[in-house]
Amino acid sequence: MSEMVDLKEFLAELGKTQKELKNVIEQAKDIGLELKTNSKMTPEQAGKLYKYIVDGIKEQIQANQPAKNPEQDNKDDLNTAVASKSLNKKVFKTPKKEETKSQPKPKKTKEKKKEAPTPIAKKKGGIEIVNTFEDQTPPVENAPKVVSHSQIEKAKQKLQEIQKSREALNKLTQSNANNANSTNNANNAKKEISEVKKQEQEIKRHENIKRRTGFRVIKRNDETENETENSVTESKKPTQSAAAIFEDIKKEWQEKDKQEAKKVKKPSKPKATPTAKNNKSHKIDFSDARDFKGNDIYDDETDEILLFDLHEQDNLNKEEEEKEIRQNINDRVRVQRKNPWMNESGIKRQSKKKRAFRNDNSQKVIQSAIAIPEEVRVYEFAQKANLNLADVIKTLFNLGLMVTKNDFLDKDSIEILAEEFHLEISVQNTLEEFEVEEVLEGVKKERPPVVTIMGHVDHGKTSLLDKIRDKRVAHTEAGGITQHIGAYMVEKNNKWVSFIDTPGHEAFSQMRNRGAQVTDIAVIVIAADDGVKQQTIEALEHAKAANVPVIFAMNKMDKPNVNPDKLKAECAELGYNPVDWGGEHEFIPVSAKTGDGIDNLLETILIQADIMELKAIEEGSARAVVLEGSVEKGRGAVATVIVQSGTLSVGDSFFAETAFGKVRTMTDDQGKSIQNLKPSMVALITGLSEVPPAGSVLIGVENDSIARLQAQKRATYLHQKALSKSTKVSFDELSEMVANKELKNIPVVIKADTQGSLEAIKNSLLELNNEEVAIQVIHSGVGGITENDLSLVSNSEHAVILGFNIRPTGNVKNKAKEYNVSIKTYTVIYALIEEMRSLLLGLMSPIIEEEHTGQAEVRETFNIPKVGTIAGCVVSDGVIARGIKARLIRDGVVIHTGEILSLKRFKDDVKEVSKGYECGIMLDNYNEIKVGDVFETYKEIHKKRTL
């Protein structure tokens, strides 16, 4: 049977996918080949289809026929054998492919060559060309590719012979009208005539197409010339002869095909050999039948020689060069298998290049510079840096950090990865992903300066601002200290100045930092009688980081014995030289109590603002910064904001982090309602969905839908970030968790009146944690204490609910007693932090110290039945007391630690024995005492820990 080529295998060799199957089937129809998804083709059909797809050479072929049963094949072969007797030139492919190629099918428009019987006699003892062969396909079908003039003459001669055979066929048709085989042969003859005519036309049109490689010439016996006319009428004898011929040829070529099965798809260049037996490196294609006489089979292959056409040597050289080029390309893309239709192909090369690119995905090109958000997931970092995700995770693992692909990377991790992979990282603001594009075009107009007042606690910052505003805010603050960030507008010389008052307590460091980030000028208030303190230095660092000019206000100048020069000297040591000392920083003496120096301070601020030429765009959507957020009864969530650009009006939609809404009302620091908020102006706004985090950016948008969408995106991002932080753990943290499995935790829920105060309390409490006890913040929020807060800690031991500037309701108090949960409220942050510090100290174990008391050497041992071993000792140092702890040391190694159960001097029990005296010592539950051992006594001293 003929070896068939599966369509799927054909697609794979072409480098095409199943999605391109439809296109291949359509192209097959163009050359007369009907294919389906699971169809198979002969190598001939596959070769022609391949040439049509790759090179565009369209050769009409017989459509693919379904496999036939052997009986039908034999009948067709017999019919072919009858017709073959009248022809002298036969061309056929490998006999293994006869079964599907030799059968005529009248319904098809194109068929393989089956020549009609012609009673034409040849000269006796002559030489005839039995067949020609090419590199790949039969010569009849590839006739348009012949360029030799001798071949053109052969084709013309063949046309004349077929015309003569048609005349003989007409006579045969009249005498055998009922013979179905004759009808088929007549159809074949007509088709052969039309094919040869087409071939002659194609020969004239094509002159530079691949040549035939040679001719097969066979010497005939004389007897074969005498019976050509009678062979047609004697149909029974040829029938038997054809069957035998078919079987013999099939057996002969089956053996050859077994040896050449692997070489069918790898054609080699034909070599000139004297016999066909030695020509095993390539196949000689034959037609479906051969001219035999009766039962006589011509098998003398020694009379068969090969003649090569040397006129086409130039074309042959070109073919060899093309084959070498194709071979080099195949070697480069590592083609592992070849077949007759995978010899030359741009498509093949393109496909292999694609495969090679897919295989090299692990070796991605690393970018030299990339832009990375401040907080990015591991897989996002790999995508942006064009790195392999597994390599990134492996690198972090080797550095001691276990992460998943969805975990977030902090700034340190990004820098480490950049160094490991030799990348240049440009860190971008995370908020930019969620911001709506701002209107950057517009006329910039002058805006008021934003001034932040900072300094140490109790140095008079709020009192100074109260004097400027003629208000008394300091008296309304609990404990007389500022615990909220405040924003105010002050008019001086028909010019407005926005003041931001920040807390001076150490717990409010982030509030001071936020104030410095939105300010234009920083006023550092220092008490002249106290000098530079810790929070003063911190405030200066915030101002320096924000790159804003600093003005020093020397407060409390009304007090006696103040020394401003000492204060200036302390600031000069920090690098801030006064103007009168040749520096560039203004030091203004003021008194918040008497008001002295206030006008001078305001004028200095306005002069500095004029020098800075502060301007901003008033048109377009507003961009503001949330200074503080809280929940007010009857108003819901409110926020104090300061506008940086654009204009915020009542009714505008906005979003800030996870909060969104529409501005319902706006009130200034005097409590007056306003409609518009321009750059550098501050106001309290309502209409928020929730309390926004302090320091978040508020963006004005077109409508509520955009605001809600942006807030939801930000909420999803923050939620995933929180999950990532809960799953990330380093090796050090993991080992610490194992070592501290007895770690004592205090679960707390923190509720405060404002977002800034809540943030300060959380940070201060977390700083109290140590290796033994820790505060675990289960929940925190702005607003009153609710029953839900109680349920969060109802099952926890030592749980505490902390309230700052809020009071629980009656129902909440009753539920707290039911759940046995402690609620503690405070109005001053000092008291809250100190009480939590004491609570942690109570849970911590005391520090144990040892005090050496005495030492005794064993001189003798006495074993007393039912009592134990008593050691006779001499006290060499200190005092040995009964009941004290002792270590038994042998050769410098402690072998036992226990208490002295009995201490005797001679026969009397004693409480203690001093240095230089002898005594008897017996340990509690230990008798392995030897001469030469040493007793070392000590006592433990317990001391309280401090945080």
Swiss-Prot record:
Ranges where the tr-type G domain occurs: 446-615
Region (G4): 555-558
Single GO MF annotation: translation initiation factor activity
Region G1, residue ranges: 455-462
Coiled-coil positions: none
Subcellular location: Cytoplasm
Low complexity bias (residue ranges): 175-188
Region (G2): 480-484
InterPro entries from the UniProt entry: EF-G-like_DII, IF2_II, IF2_N, P-loop_NTPase, Small_GTP-bd, T_Tr_GTP-bd_dom, TF_IF2_bacterial-like, TIF_IF2
Composition skew (Basic residues), residue ranges: 207-218
Region annotation (G5) ranges: 591-593
Compositional bias (Basic and acidic residues): 151-169, 189-206, 247-262
Source domain of life: Bacteria
Region feature Disordered, mapped onto this chain: 61-284
Keyword GTP-binding: yes
Disulfide bridge positions per record: none
One GO location term (cellular component): cytosol
Residue numbers spanned by region G3: 501-504
Its biological purpose: One of the essential components for the initiation of protein synthesis. Protects formylmethionyl-tRNA from spontaneous hydrolysis and promotes its binding to the 30S ribosomal subunits. Also involved in the hydrolysis of GTP during the formation of the 70S ribosomal complex.
Protein name as catalogued: Translation initiation factor IF-2
Native species: Helicobacter pylori (strain P12)
Gene designation per UniProt: infB
